[in-house]
């Protein structure tokens, strides 16, 4: 039915941006490496923000009266508006859907999506078929946002709306954290294999494409009618499991969320199928200007209330759609379900043996009753063996069901916020969860400046090379993802599974470095009697700093990279191996690593994607690549891109030699993806390179930056800029401190 609506309305979908399409090698073809898209490295949201460069949400939040805000939200739930009447006189179910669909776009593969940043306010998400009419939900929240202003973000308010709604309807949440900051424009996430809304599936041969979480462009998870709109219960179960797992949910959490969410509210499909094209207007992004950002104008009947058109499915699941109960599971197991069609022609299921106590109230006409409904996806929770295990368990244990839903809801709405140290507000639960990537709180005294000096000397005397120290620190810190604030150096998870075993980290070499650093750590901690300790996480970063400083010294430059102690060491029990494997990248151009899954001409774009995840801009990415090549820290000791006669010294030789016209570049005849630098006069081979190396002389913007670092007189600038960018990467994920 959703596809029919999209087809009828002529919604052709959105063009996709290139940056995140790197995740699927078969999806994006670049004719040449120089066509690299640098837009992910431009922080346009910050430039476009109307809040000003000095605005600090955390500071502004301090003036928020959270209890007053909550009271206003509770009052709003039952203040039905004539322009969009509340079903059952309560906006609670509507706001739960708003929050869920905002947070539910999160995906583990690259950390994109989720409620943080409030992307649902912008195209394309605001116009997805699955988000039909949520423009009205956000409009209902506007008076509250207007009242509290910049003390509360849109992204926090949207999630809070659903959480307060749950509590008001008898489902007490385990807590809520503020701290989400708003974007000011739609991002360029690649949401599907095809740009056409609901026109093709992200599922091929029964498998969801690894880059995605929703099964089709324009959906949050799956089509409720079944795969591609077909009422196939078994197929629906498979797609549900894959989609929810791609968002980080277990089978138990998936069942709790679906069964709990469908305890509330109703779905809307009042418009007859034959009238949809005539009566339903376009989504917000294509709506007439006089509608002021509201879409899906409905000319059928009153266009609202009982005449509302949403997904096309029509009805409620339970007899008390504005109060938490056990009816969904009771109906699932005690009623016999037959396939029917909604007034809009959508596939749904109604019972053949409904009793008076099973009937559900009409959303707007007192005394009128209807049969309950189920989606094809709802029945999958009963028919699939894996899901059935938990629906039975919850059916027999209502209190467990309530508790598991509360935990799953908190995870759904907070998963993309990163570690708990980013949470603010009075309602943060004390409990820690493994999906928060917890790290221990330091119960010891941090190292002093004198201690740091001693440890640096211990590292210098350890016998570890600069290259070993630099690579280990880089591999530890560069796991960070700005999208969901995961990874980074804090926790020293490079010493734990799965990171210690990743090919890109060269496990055998890594083990040698970690053993030596642990020895230094043990000796230092055992010799301190004043309660001072140093973590392995801090030592890894300090070791990298030492390596860079020593390499600069060998090149004739004196630098001191700032070091901020306070990192702690996570345990294996605090580390979800499956979840952390999503932080493993296919390519890291900073060390010329590739796992072989990407074509050579896609490696420059993969570098940009990596740099974007590290929150770097174009000059920072450029100086880091040039410095890392000079430092000779490539994966597997490769010499590709090491354009220097003094490998291991921190200097600007990479840029000087890259831009030297005495060198002519040709593709290698023997090694695919490799380029040979040949002396124009003698014909002798001078260098070897990858497409990542040569992009800095090929792409006009990157070449402009490279030329700055190759200029006479800018040698010290290069070293200083490298040190600054290096420190930035080492500090990623340090939400426990503010520099």
Curated annotation (Swiss-Prot):
One Pfam family named in its UniProt record: peroxidase
PTM (free text): Formation of the three residue Trp-Tyr-Met cross-link is important for the catalase, but not the peroxidase activity of the enzyme.
A Gene Ontology BP annotation from the UniProt entry: hydrogen peroxide catabolic process
Residues annotated as the enzyme's active site: 101 (proton acceptor)
EC top class named in words: oxidoreductase
EC number per UniProt: 1.11.1.21
Source species, domain of life: Bacteria
Cross-link (Tryptophyl-tyrosyl-methioninium (Tyr-Met) (with W-100)), chain numbering: 221-247
Keywords, sorted A to Z: Heme, Hydrogen peroxide, Iron, Metal-binding, Oxidoreductase, Peroxidase, Signal
Residues the record marks as site: Transition state stabilizer: 97
Signal peptide location: 1-23
Residues given in the record as heme b binding sites: 262
GO cellular component: cytosol
Cofactor binding mode and count: Binds 1 heme b (iron(II)-protoporphyrin IX) group per dimer.
Cross-link (Tryptophyl-tyrosyl-methioninium (Trp-Tyr) (with M-247)): 100-221
GO molecular-function terms, A-Z: catalase activity; heme binding; metal ion binding
Cofactor(s) listed in the protein's UniProt record: heme b
InterPro entries, sorted: Catalase_peroxidase, Haem_peroxidase, Haem_peroxidase_sf, Peroxidases_AS, Peroxidases_heam-ligand_BS
Task of the protein: Bifunctional enzyme with both catalase and broad-spectrum peroxidase activity.
Similarity comment: Belongs to the peroxidase family. Peroxidase/catalase subfamily.
PANTHER family named in the record: CATALASE-PEROXIDASE, HYDROPEROXIDASE I, BIFUNCTIONAL CATALASE-PEROXIDASE
Assembly with partners or alone: Homodimer or homotetramer.
Name used for this protein in its record: Catalase-peroxidase
Organism annotation: Francisella philomiragia subsp. philomiragia (strain ATCC 25017 / CCUG 19701 / FSC 153 / O#319-036)
């Amino acid at each position: 039915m959703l596809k029919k609506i999209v087809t009828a309305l002529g919604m052709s979908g959105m063009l996709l941006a290139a940056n995140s399409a790197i995740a699927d090698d078969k999806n994006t073809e670049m004719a040449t490496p120089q066509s690299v898209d640098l837009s992910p490295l431009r922080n346009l949201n910050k430039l476009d923000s109307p809040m000003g460069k000095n605005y600090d949400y955390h500071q502004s939040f301090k003036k928020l009266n959270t209890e007053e805000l909550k009271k206003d939200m509770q009052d709003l739930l039952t203040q039905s508006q004539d322009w969009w009447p509340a079903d059952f006189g309560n906006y609670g179910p509507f706001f739960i859907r708003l929050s869920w669909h905002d947070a539910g776009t999160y995906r583990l593969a690259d950390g994109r999506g989720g409620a943080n940043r409030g992307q649902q306010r912008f195209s394309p998400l605001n116009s997805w078929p699955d988000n039909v009419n949520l423009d009205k939900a956000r409009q209902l929240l506007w008076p509250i946002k207007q009242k509290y202003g910049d003390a509360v973000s849109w992204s926090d308010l949207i999630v809070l709306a659903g959480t307060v709604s749950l509590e008001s309807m008898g489902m007490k949440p385990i807590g809520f954290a503020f701290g989400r900051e708003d974007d000011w424009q739609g991002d360029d996430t690649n949401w599907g294999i095809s740009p056409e809304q609901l026109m093709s599936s992200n599922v091929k041969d029964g498998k969801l494409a690894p880059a995605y979480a929703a099964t089709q462009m324009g959906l949050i998870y799956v089509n409720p009618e079944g795969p591609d709109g077909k009422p196939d219960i078994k197929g629906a179960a498979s797609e549900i499991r894959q989609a929810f797992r791609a968002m980080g949910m277990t089978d138990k959490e998936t069942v709790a969320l679906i069964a709990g969410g469908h305890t509330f509210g109703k779905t809307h499909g009042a418009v007859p199928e034959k009238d949809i094209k005539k009566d339903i207007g376009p989504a917000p992004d294509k709506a007439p200007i006089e509608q002021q950002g509201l879409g899906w104008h409905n000319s059928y009947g009153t266009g609202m209330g009982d005449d509302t058109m949403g997904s096309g499915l029509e009805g409620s699941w339970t007899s008390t759609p504005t109060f938490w109960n056990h009816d969904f599971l009771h109906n699932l197991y005690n009623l016999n379900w037959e396939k029917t069609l909604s007034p809009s022609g959508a596939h749904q299921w109604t019972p053949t043996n409904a009793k008076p106590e099973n009937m559900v109230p009409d959303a707007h006409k007192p005394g009128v009753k209807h049969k309950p409904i189920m989606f094809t996806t709802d029945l999958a929770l009963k028919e699939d063996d894996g899901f059935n295990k938990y629906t039975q368990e919850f059916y027999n244990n209502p209190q467990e069901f309530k508790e598991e839903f509360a935990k799953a809801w908190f995870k759904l709405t907070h998963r993309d916020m990163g570690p708990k140290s980013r949470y603010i507000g009075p309602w943060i639960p004390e409990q820690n969860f493994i999906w928060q990537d917890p790290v221990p709180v330091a119960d010891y005294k941090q190292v002093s400046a004198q201690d740091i000096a001693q440890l640096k000397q211990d590292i210098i005397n350890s016998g570890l090379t600069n290259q070993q120290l630099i690579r280990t620190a880089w591999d530890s810190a560069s796991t960070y993802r700005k999208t969901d604030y995961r990874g980074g150096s804090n926790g020293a998870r490079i010493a734990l599974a799965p990171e210690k075993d990743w090919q890109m980290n060269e496990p055998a070499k890594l083990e040698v470095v970690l053993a030596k650093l642990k020895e230094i750590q043990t000796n230092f901690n055992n010799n301190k009697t004043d309660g001072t300790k140093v973590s392995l996480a801090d030592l890894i970063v300090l070791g990298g700093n030492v390596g860079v400083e020593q390499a600069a010294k060998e090149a004739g430059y004196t630098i001191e990279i700032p070091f901020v102690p306070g990192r702690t060491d996570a345990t294996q029990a605090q580390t979800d191996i499956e979840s952390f494997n999503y932080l493993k990248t296919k390519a890291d151009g900073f060390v010329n690593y590739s796992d072989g899954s990407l074509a050579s001409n896609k490696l420059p774009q993969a570098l940009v994607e990596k740099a974007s995840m590290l929150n770097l801009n174009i000059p920072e990415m450029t100086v880091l690549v040039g410095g890392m090549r000079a430092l000779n820290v490539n994966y597997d000791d490769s010499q590709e891109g090491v354009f220097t006669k003094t490998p291991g010294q921190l200097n600007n030789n990479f840029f000087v030699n890259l831009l030297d016209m005495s060198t002519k570049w040709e593709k290698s005849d023997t090694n695919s993806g490799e380029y040979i630098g040949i002396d124009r006069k003698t014909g002798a081979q001078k260098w070897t390179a990858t497409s990542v190396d040569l992009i800095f002389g090929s792409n006009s913007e990157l070449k402009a930056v490279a030329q700055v670092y190759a200029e006479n007189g800018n040698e010290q600038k290069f070293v200083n800029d490298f040190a600054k960018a290096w420190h930035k990467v080492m500090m990623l994920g340090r939400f426990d401190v503010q520099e």
